[in-house]
């Protein structure tokens, strides 16, 4: 049932995108008719009931299913019997230890950073540098289907074991002490064709780094980390309808404004 709900949602979302891109003339045509009569089976009308029923249908979905249904690629579990997997896990372990040590240093770049969101890129850069220095491994920013490098969006890093060509995706996450069991959203994946960065069957990892509250002196202190295999990771859908300022403040929609 969850699989069906996910497929219906993805299909409806794709159809809505197509409808949004339709010619304006067609939009003008439909606006002349009443909404129920002009599009009784419109994708949005099919989508809304699924969103309202998300507590039953769209929770506890395996991330591996989401990846496969949106990209056609498989999320591979770590194989503890594989020499390649053991070697990569060991390399990531060493890189995580060295990254924490490096960035906790008083002179590190993060110690002059005020917002924790701005610290994340330093972890990505440090891990990438350390993993690239590991013989037999390559680590870089994953590219989209068009070959573009994007820092935003999942995943952050792509590791490849050069001899076997086995791919590992690594996504560093930072969280505060005491928030480990929080139910607030800390992970998201947005299915898009143009900006998709998952392009191979791969092992998917999250490296979670825990930090203390920023000290009065301004110092950041990271205390521990965990490497998580996402093969059995489950997610839920939180759908929202969005609009920009350009969408809101259209001249024809403004009915009053302040005096000049």
Question: Regions from the language model: what does each represent?
Answer:
Residues 28-126:
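Interdomain/boundary linker segments immediately adjacent to catalytic/signaling cores
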Residues 197-259:
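Domain-level recognition of nuclease-like catalytic cores that cleave nucleotide substrates
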Residues 8-17:
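Bacterial N-terminal signal peptides
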Residues 17-27:
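Bacterial Sec-dependent signal peptides at the C-terminal "C-region" and cleavage site
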């Amino acid at each position: 049932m969850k699989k069906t709900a996910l497929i219906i949602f993805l299909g409806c979302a794709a159809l809505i995108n197509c409808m949004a891109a339709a010619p304006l003339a067609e939009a003008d045509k439909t606006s002349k008719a009443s909404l129920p009569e002009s599009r009784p089976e419109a994708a949005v009308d099919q989508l809304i009931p699924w969103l309202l029923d998300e507590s039953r249908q769209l929770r506890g979905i395996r991330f591996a299913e989401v990846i496969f249904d949106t990209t056609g690629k498989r999320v591979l579990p770590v194989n503890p019997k594989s020499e390649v997997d053991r070697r990569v896990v060991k390399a990531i372990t060493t890189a995580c230890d060295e990254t924490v040590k490096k960035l906790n240093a008083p002179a590190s770049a993060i110690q002059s950073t005020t917002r924790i969101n701005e610290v994340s890129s330093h972890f990505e850069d440090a891990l990438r540098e350390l993993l690239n220095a590991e013989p037999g491994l390559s680590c870089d920013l994953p590219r989209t289907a068009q070959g573009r490098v994007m820092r935003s969006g999942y995943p952050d890093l792509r590791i490849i074991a050069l001899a076997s060509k086995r791919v590992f995706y690594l996504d560093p996450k930072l969280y505060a002490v005491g928030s480990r069991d929080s139910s607030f959203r800390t992970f998201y994946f947005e299915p898009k064709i143009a900006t998709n960065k998952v392009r191979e069957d791969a092992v998917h990892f999250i490296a979670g780094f825990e930090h203390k509250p920023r000290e009065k002196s301004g110092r950041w202190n990271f205390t521990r980390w965990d490497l998580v295999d996402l093969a059995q990771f489950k997610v839920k859908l939180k759908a929202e309808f969005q609009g920009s300022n350009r969408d809101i403040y259209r001249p024809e929609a403004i009915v009053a404004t302040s005096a000049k």
